[in-house]
Amino acid sequence: MEWTSVIEQDAARLARLALAEDGERDLTSLAVHAGRITAQGRIEARSETVLAGCRYADAVARLVKIKLEWMADDGRRIPAGGIVGTLVGDLGSILRAERTILNLLQRASGIATITRQYVDTVEGTACTILHTRKTAPGLRVFDVHAVQLGGGGLHRLDLAGIAMIKDNHWAALARNGTSLADAVQEARRLGAQAVQVEVETAEQLKLACAAGADRLLIDNQTPERLRTWGARARELRPGVEIEATGGISLKNVRRFAEAGADFISVGALTHSVVAADLALEIEPGS
């Protein structure tokens, strides 16, 4: 299935789930007879943000039958005070959808904004910023789509596509007597699109290159060691990709990029989200 179709299906699923969390009736809006009023509202950015989540907000708007028009596209940088979009419909429906739409936009835009900061920081290098699987449960596609809108690249979405042999898998190999080379070969036989191996020592790096790993994951090392290990890996296995992760922040990410990382994966893009500051205002007299 194409990625765009995956996003559309996920948006419809998440919109239904999020609205269901608020129950079948909005007692407050019913009490003030909000459904009798046709209203217009606007979504504002209270601080600079990279907009994301529009497809998901659209899915909510369709379910509650309000009209949502965007003043900017997904992935656009919105200045503080900028109008993101407008809504028209009966006030009861707008109020019912308000928090759901904002929750989706604020989380997605928060992810896109921090991702864009990382991408901008490594600009001019050959390095790509990646997400990890450290996403909120049930929000994998949503979170990853937001990373993309911020300029990040696609990593593995699940355990079925790319094999990644990490420290605990190394421990399993040691216990069952299987060699790394055999594990890499078996992963390919099982249909792995690629095989990535985490290395923590120079000896593991040598073994991973000999086993035919497509990419090496270098975790919690210094930029200097990354440079040394990366150069050695490319001597042993020309074309092998180098991914850095662990202990990387906006303050030091460029050092890792300049040290030769092809990819840098950052868990904080999705596991420590700071929501974008967005608000929905009902226009007076509407």
Describe every region a protein language model picked out.
Residues 248, 256-263, 282-285:
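Ligand-binding grooves and catalytic loops that recognize ribose/phosphate and carbohydrate rings
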Residues 268-286:
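Short, charged, intrinsically disordered terminal tails
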Residues 220, 246, 267-268:
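Short secondary-structure boundary segments
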Residues 171, 223-224, 281:
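A generic signature of intrinsically disordered, low-complexity regions enriched in glycine/proline
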Residues 235-241, 284-286:
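Short acidic, glycine/proline-enriched helix-loop-strand junctions
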Residues 1-200, 204-211, 215, 227-232, ...:
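Acidic/glycine-rich phosphate/pyrophosphate-binding loops and surrounding catalytic core
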